[in-house]
Curated annotation (Swiss-Prot):
The species this protein was found in: Mus musculus (Mouse)
Protein name as annotated: GLIPR1-like protein 2
Chain positions carrying an annotated carbohydrate: 145
Chain ranges of the SCP domain: 57-191
Localization: Membrane
Gene designation per UniProt: Glipr1l2
Lineage: Eukaryota, Metazoa, Chordata, Craniata, Vertebrata
Amino acid sequence: MKASLPWSVVWRAQSNYVRLRRVLKLCELWLLLVGSGLNAKLPLEEDVDFINEYVGLHNELRGTVFPPGVNLRFMTWDVALSRTARAWGKKCMYSRNTHLDKLHESHPVFTEIGENMWVGPVEDFTVTTAIRSWHEERKSYSYLNDTCVEDQNCSHYIQLVWDSSYKVGCAVTSCARAGGFTHAALFICNYAPGGTLTRRPYQAGQFCSRCGPGDQCTDYLCSNTVRDEATYYQFWYPPWEKPRPVVCNPMCIFILFLRVASLLLCVIVVLIVQSRFPVILMETPTIISAEEEGKTEVEIVMEEGEGEGEGGEGEGEGEEKEEEEMLEEDEQ
């Protein structure tokens, strides 16, 4: 017979095996994260330096269009547009956002939203690389004929220099695979109002010569302090975003306040009632004499039976007296 190992030795071996498996799982998870590009230091959509970089580059390229534009607007950042870009980027789909044409699904105010997308390896991504690649499409676009070279795409450039657009929001997302790239970066910018392909992107002429009322010329673009003011939509997020950020809007805050107030009111009422009626929840004690305590249950039952019998006899005597009185009245 083979000698069996002590149980303590077996238990330690199994415990070490379980620990080793856990370590291997953690290493595997770490490798997956590295492989998917999640460790890449891509900026968040509300990072100030990131915002200043892409907004500044948009305005720089818009202010140097050729031929010059008479009415191109100055661009400023919009948080709702950047949230929409982030939400669609999380899907890692290098295709047009299907929610852009649906009312208030891409912005709480604007109804016409434009979009530009760039995809490439994570290590190749920079804001300048992505946006200038859209600007390079101008080489395939003829402003005079309002046409694009056959088999070429000019839509990114047209949106980039669309005259009526003045709000922009961008986001970059790391994807395991997107647009034919592995370990990809998906960069999306949304614009409001969005551009179309129904006309030239702007009117040619002297810079800022046809700005609107109240506008001023800033870096060869039409700016307006009221129009360019930043609006922070605190409680708005794309309704189709998954997983959705946890947000408590004014109605949620009101309901929470109402519940807390109701709870406090109930506590106050209970305290007032208890202070005015201190014995309201106390049971009234039943006083039992020493003689009754000494009696057995059988004796108590017998006494109750005798009482009922006496009551029955009393009722019988009363009925006989009533019958005698009735007979005497009949005789009279």
